[in-house]
Every structure is written in structure tokens, then in C-alpha cells.
Amino acid sequence: MPRALLCLLLLLPASAAASGYADLGKLEREAVDDALALRGLQIEPEPLGRIIGAVQVVNLDVFLARERVPLVWANIFHRTTREHHVRRESLLQAGNRYDQDLVEETTRNLQDPSLSNVVAVLPVKSATPGIVDLLIVTRDVWSLRLNEDFQAQQNYLLYFTASLSENNLFGWRKYMAAVFVMDQGEMSLGPNYSDPNILGTRLKLEAAFYWLWKRDAGQFNPGPHEGTSSRFHLEYPLYSLASRWGAAVDFSHFDGVYRRFFGTDLFRIPLDGISRSICNPGPYDPAGVPWMYRLKAINTSEMVTRSFPRPSVIQRVSAGHELALLRPSFTPDFPYADGSIERSQFAQEVFPLSERISDLFLRYELFTPRYRTYRDLNTFDFREDIRLGPSLSLKAGRASTLIGSDKDLTLFQTSLDLAADWWGGLQSVGGSWEARLAGDELTDQLVRGRVTLATPVLARVFRVVAAGNVAFLYENRRNRYFVEGGDTGLRGYPVGEFVGCGAEFIGHVEVRTMALKLAFLRLGGLVFFDAGDAAANAQSLTFYDDVGFGLRLLIPQLNTYALRADWAFPLRPAPGMPAGWPGRMTFGFRQVF
């Protein structure tokens, strides 16, 4: 340990744990030590109740010499976040009384994986007796970058996105990028912009626009131009738990071609005159018609929220308006003429319900403002805050032709989740229900259940994490369906392998190691088990499962999420995948669940 750092630690009072220092992770503690040494500060052991004299901000460089990263010179090309932009995000300012709950909330608010990999807020001794100062320590991730994310299996790229971006424009915490996205059937390119503080206010803006082109299977050259998509979000957020008013406006549109895939090929269905539905479109037929159609979709919402905060529980009531427009149609190259039986059969089997729903809604939310900080759960060493206790949401809306809807109906959405941290782990269970009521008929019921379990770190070496989801559709008038496969977490099977419009389940168990530090890198491994299926009803579900192993690599200076490489082996054969060797390899970012 360097002598200067050792001397600094000796100066820290034994009660530093009461100020939060002892709860910091390794990367955070190193950053705080750097900041204390840089400013000549000491932790204040007894800050509670004192008036804050000043809010000091230290934002460290991306690359530090002590980490022996051969890129320290690159710091000259990065503009660290300006101190006053960090300072104004603090819920505690000079003249306020020190409050540990607001310190924790400020830390959570400042956490943004695209901007910082370290955020720590601590009390420090002030030069004025009886006063305490607040120290905010952050460390930027590299912002001028070519961001990438991808999913691949063997030699086929399923999904790829790249953006030439400035994630922290001029150090103002604003994001601007040109974004390219490629999935199995489409390529898109367009500008993105995000501003969390418009003109220094609390207003938040996110906007994006994309031009769409066709992608032929396995090709990297764009095909014909097919349409556009966009999204726009303007919000006055509930920026603290004590905030009482919030509002938001959203708009999105899609005008392009929707495709369904079977593995790496377009799913094809036979148009043989046999009456079927979207729940039973018939088997994959290599000589059939490709599952693709043109889709125009528009979604808008306007909402005002009133919050009723109390120390033990937060209640919120929201009211607003929503518009959802969905119009499917045939592509120009559909092989059958207007009025043909084949067209009618294809529309019946493939198209979602064409509709325009305009509704006024009321929503009630309740949750407990209690949080726990985890580490080495979904990433390595970084702080991960999870809210504990109950979380309830009740929503009802009334759609009417008087406000532009093409039908009169009532919409319901409910959800309830419970999270706990017994024995130092994480336990979360929840469920949701949504439905439509038209007259006295209840339709389109969607019931979901979910569970997440995580042990504490065992023997300082590993953690066991499990998750499961189950869902059922009843009276499915909107032609919705479930899809399970390699892109939804069933890693041993191809994309879109299992489809059903009545029931689905997916479950995972992983044994994840703690990180091994290799110079400035973090390396971890895991073994896993997946199981899942989608079918026409619960009775038709089959237990398809796989086992495998994977690696996780984290470069803290560039990302707060890990690079993922998994190799899975199916235990049960499926139409698109034999059991056992050679299995299926996938690559991407972030954990699967």
C-alpha cells in the first residue's frame, strides 16, 4: 500500500463507518481516498444534525496513473463533468441540515452508468467549528466513444447497435449520438439526444429519430428503405422522494415492416386453406409465405402526478390520457392478390388486432422508500441499489368514441411486488394482471408472476442467483403471443424457437463468481441452468432446458456493465436444435437476467 494512502487511512476516525465510508466498495473507497488526499480533507465522524457549510465536488479522471492503465494520456480528450452540474443534483445544499437519508438519495440520483462508474457522498470536516461540509466524489467513464452492444450466436449476428456519441457533452451530463441499430430483419440509423436538465431546470428531455432499411438474412448491407420510427419524452420528474408534483408527455411512432424469425431464418407459414389462428399458424414450411407485414403504430401519453410522501410510505396518484393506434397491412410484395383466400388466411393467422384506443386513466401507486445496496450482483463491485418492501400499482382507464377511440371499453392494470433482504440476500416476488372490459365481457386478460432470489456472497467466492417468470393469456382478442428462445434467455435454443399465445414460462439459476482483478480489468465466471417454453395453453407447456457456462469481463473505465460470453447445451431436443454437443454460443453485454 502506498505510504501516503496508509497515512491517510490512519487519519480516518474509527467511527468513519457511521459516515458511510466503511460501506463503500473497493472502487468507491479508492476514489474517496484520492479525493480526500487531493483536497486535504478528513471524514466527519459525527455529522448528524449539523448545518452544511459547503458542498464540495471532486470528479476524478477516467484513467488514473495508480491503476497502471496505459491510457492516462487520453484524459486530455475527455471533459470531466463540471462540478456545478454535479452540485446542483444534490438534495443537500449549503445551509441545509445534514440528513443521511438525503445523502443516500443523492447518491442514487447521481448514479448513471453512462456517465459515472463511481458515486460517493460523504460528510467531511469543515474549517468552521460546528459546521460540516459535504463531499461528492464521482468518476467519469469515457464519454467520447463508439458505444457498442451486440448479441451473437456462432457465426451469426442477431443484434448489433453502435453509436458515435458524446455521453457527457462538454461535461454538462447531456448525451448526443448518431445511433445505428441492426436486428435480424432491419437496420436503422438516426440521431439521439438526452438532456436531464434543460437550461438548468429540472425538466428532462429524451428524443430519437430513425430511418429504417431492410436487412436480408445474414447480410450487412442495407436493403430498400422501409420507413421511420421515433420517440420523444419530456418530463418534470419527481426528482426526490419528497417531491409532490410531476408530469410527463410521451410520443412514439413506428412505420415499417415487422418480421418474425425461426432461428436465423424468416418464419414461413403454409397458406393451404386450412383455417388457423395466430395461436396455431401451422408448422414452419420452407416453401411457405414469410411472416412479415407492414405496421403503423402511434403511441402518445400525457400525465400529471401528485405524490404524498411520508417517511414510511410513498403514495402517488396520476391522471392522464393515452392514445394507441395499431394498423397492420400487407407488404407490397405479398405474393397473393387482393381478395384472395390466401390473403384472408394470412391476415387471420398473422396480423395483430387493428385498433385505435383513446382513453382517460387514473393510476394509484404505493411503495416503501427503503433501499439496500448490493455489490457483485449484476456487475462487479459497483453499487446496485434495490428498493425493498411492497410496491403496488392500480390503474384504470376508460376509452370512448367521444375522445377518438374506435370502441368503448374499460382497461385495467394492476401489479404487486414484494422485495426483502433476509439473511443478507435478495428475495423478490410479484405478479400483475391486465384486462379489458367491453360491456359485460372481460377479454385480453394477461396474468404474470415473477420471482427473483439471490444468496449473499458465499465463502467470499460466489453467489447463487435465480429468477423465474410465468404468464398466461385468456380471451386473447388482440392476437398477442409469447416467444421464447435464445434472445429471451433460453440460451441453448435458437431465437424464436417456441411460440404460443396462451402460456409461457422461463427460469434461470446461475452460480456467479466474484471478480478476479487482472490489472485494471475484472474477470468473472458462472455456470447456469435455463428452462422455458411457450405454448397454446398451460397444459401444452413442455420443459425445455439447457446447461452451460460463461465468462464476464468488465473494464470499469469504459463501462459499468460486463461483456458476456455464454456456451449452452440443450438437454432436450427441439425442432430447431438437437440436444447436447455442439450447443450454442452467444455474446453480448449485461447479464441475461
Predicted feature descriptions by range:
Residues S19-L158, A162-E166, A177-D195, R215-F232, ...:
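Periplasmic polypeptide-binding modules associated with outer-membrane biogenesis and secretion
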Residues P45-E46, L169-Y175, N197-L205, Y239-A247, ...:
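Short loop/turn motifs that connect adjacent beta-strands in outer-membrane beta-barrel proteins
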Residues V58-L60, D149-Q153, S165-N167, V179-D183, ...:
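Outer-membrane beta-barrel pore domains and translocons
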Residues S90, P390-F593:
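C-terminal transmembrane beta-barrel domains of outer membrane proteins
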Residues F160-L169, M187-A207, S230-L238, T300-R306, ...:
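Feature captures outer-membrane beta-barrel proteins of Gram-negative bacteria and organelles
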Residues S188-S194, A217-H225, S229, E235, ...:
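Outer-membrane beta-barrel translocator domains and adjoining extracellular loop/strand segments
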Residues P191-F330:
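Transmembrane beta-barrel wall of Gram-negative outer-membrane proteins
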